[in-house]
């Protein structure tokens, strides 16, 4: 029963990725004063399934000098890594509440760097390798700030369980108590998922499409799905940590949709950053702010519970 329920949840998650791409294309269309996809099905609602079919039935070509087996396996491993992190999502039949959910999330999200690196290396292409190096350095840089932000809230709550974050936000959200930290978190999430304005793996002028430049058809679709799976799960974690959401309420899913739309909105409005400014932002701005908040939360905890240390 557990296996059936988990597989059913993964199917629902994969379908949600399709409709998330439809929402993105529709939103970008209306923001740019055009219609977006509206031909397949009623108002284009079947467009994701049409795109998926057209990608997976294409002929798969392999670069002559690529490492064939690793090149073939890498997108599948990237998708498995993105799906594996959804074990953290609690649902009724198999309510998995990890006591170490925070550490599990950090471990799984940091594993995505290896997928980027192997994809760029196995293609044996100069452009994909260059995009891979930039993506990996960006992901590792922002992973540090992301971990420090989560460490600060761990010091405040004394728990790695995501459900405890909801219990501590029944009266006021953490996004209101620590607004700068919330902005830092959202920026780090965009950099972690290679989204605009931090999408340096896809610099069209010099890198074509980044680390996945040699992939096409079904292999590209797997990389695309894994990227959007990560975006949806990052939005879900943001809802839990900063917006006090209960999984059993409708408001949780409304907040999740609004956060997903926020990622789309930023993509449609902001230009791409310069790479040196990106690194400056990670190491000189976000990391000090997160360290200051760690010190602040630790001092607050010490003042409130100082009698335990006597």
Curated annotation (Swiss-Prot):
Main location group: mitochondrion
- List the membrane topology term(s): Multi-pass membrane protein
InterPro entries cross-referenced by the UniProt entry:
NADH_UbQ_OxRdtase_su1/FPO, NADH_UbQ_OxRdtase_su1_CS
Q: Which UniProt keywords apply?
A: Electron transport, Membrane, Mitochondrion, Mitochondrion inner membrane, NAD, Respiratory chain, Translocase, Transmembrane, Transmembrane helix, Transport, Ubiquinone
Pfam short name (any one)? NADHdh
What are the transmembrane regions?
3-23, 69-89, 100-120, 137-157, 171-191, 223-243, 246-266, 278-298
State the reactions this protein catalyses: a ubiquinone + NADH + 5 H(+)(in) = a ubiquinol + NAD(+) + 4 H(+)(out)
Q: What is its EC number?
A: 7.1.1.2
Identify the enzyme class. translocase
Location relative to the cell: Mitochondrion inner membrane
What does the record list as GO biological process? aerobic respiration
Top-level taxon in the UniProt lineage:
Eukaryota
The molecular function GO annotations come to: NADH dehydrogenase (ubiquinone) activity
CC annotations in GO = mitochondrial inner membrane
Q: Which family does it belong to?
A: Belongs to the complex I subunit 1 family.
Q: What does this protein do?
A: Core subunit of the mitochondrial membrane respiratory chain NADH dehydrogenase (Complex I) that is believed to belong to the minimal assembly required for catalysis. Complex I functions in the transfer of electrons from NADH to the respiratory chain. The immediate electron acceptor for the enzyme is believed to be ubiquinone.
What is the name of the protein in this document? NADH-ubiquinone oxidoreductase chain 1
| Gene name for this UniProt entry | MT-ND1
């Amino acid at each position: 029963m557990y296996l059936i329920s988990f597989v059913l949840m993964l199917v629902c998650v994969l379908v949600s990725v399709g409709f998330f791409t439809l929402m993105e294309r529709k939103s970008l269309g209306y923001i740019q004063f055009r219609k977006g996809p509206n031909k397949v099905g009623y108002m284009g609602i079947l467009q994701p399934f049409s795109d998926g079919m057209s990608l997976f039935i294409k002929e798969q070509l392999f670069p002559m000098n690529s490492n064939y087996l690793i090149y073939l396996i890498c997108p599948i491993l990237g998708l498995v890594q993105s799906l594996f992190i959804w074990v953290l999502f609690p649902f009724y039949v198999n309510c998995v509440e990890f006591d170490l959910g925070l550490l599990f999330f950090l471990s799984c999200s940091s594993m995505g760097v290896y997928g980027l690196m192997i994809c760029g290396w196995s293609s044996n292409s100069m452009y994909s390798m260059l995009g891979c190096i930039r993506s990996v350095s960006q992901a590792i840089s922002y992973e540090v700030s992301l971990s420090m932000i989560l460490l600060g809230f761990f010091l405040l709550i004394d728990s790695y369980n995501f459900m405890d974050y909801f219990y501590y936000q029944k009266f006021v959200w953490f996004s209101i108590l620590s607004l700068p930290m919330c902005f830092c978190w959202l920026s780090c999430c965009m950099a972690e998922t290679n989204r605009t304005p931090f999408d340096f793996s896809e610099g069209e002028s010099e890198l074509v499409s980044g680390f996945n430049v040699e992939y096409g058809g079904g292999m590209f679709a797997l990389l695309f799905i894994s990227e959007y799976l990560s975006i949806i799960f990052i939005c879900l974690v943001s809802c839990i940590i900063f917006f006090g959401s209960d999984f059993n309420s409708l408001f949780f899913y409304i907040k999740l949709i609004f956060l997903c739309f926020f990622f789309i909105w930023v993509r449609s409005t902001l230009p791409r950053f310069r790479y040196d400014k990106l690194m400056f932002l990670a190491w000189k701005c976000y990391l000090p702010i997160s360290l200051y908040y760690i010190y602040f939360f630790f001092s607050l905890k010490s003042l409130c519970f100082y009698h335990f240390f006597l």
